[in-house]
């Protein structure tokens, strides 16, 4: 009987307040603050204002990808409407990017979203995150044409994917 490699990416379901989610929220605060000109404290507070129960069953979830026990990628989803889940907080540790972890995360989130009965995935990202836009496009998401309202100098870019 062979054992799985210790360095194999493994996903666990957590809630927003789980210590495994802390690196996700902390690095997202740094990333968003640097790209959009806010303070880390303000972004951190904003990230935590989303009610944690919206990222919990039965309508939502949060997954963290562990590599050798260390959180390296993660993301959440919540109910958008009866047939659509909305992705939130998609993140990969900057030291582990460009290794396929984000695509593996999206696939795992989509599997969980399908299991919850949703058929579509909606998301927005900021216009200063071209890497995120490239990830979503290369993962089968379609950029929506209609412009979304700007939030200050931030222009959200929306994507949609129908799951099979």
PLM segments and residue spans:
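Residues that form or flank phosphate/diphosphate-binding pockets in enzymes
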Residues: 20, 100, 131
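Short coil/turn segments at alpha/beta junctions that flank glycine-rich nucleotide-binding fingerprints
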Residues: 83, 99, 115-119
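Conserved GNAT acetyl-CoA-binding A-motif
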Residues: 106, 113-125
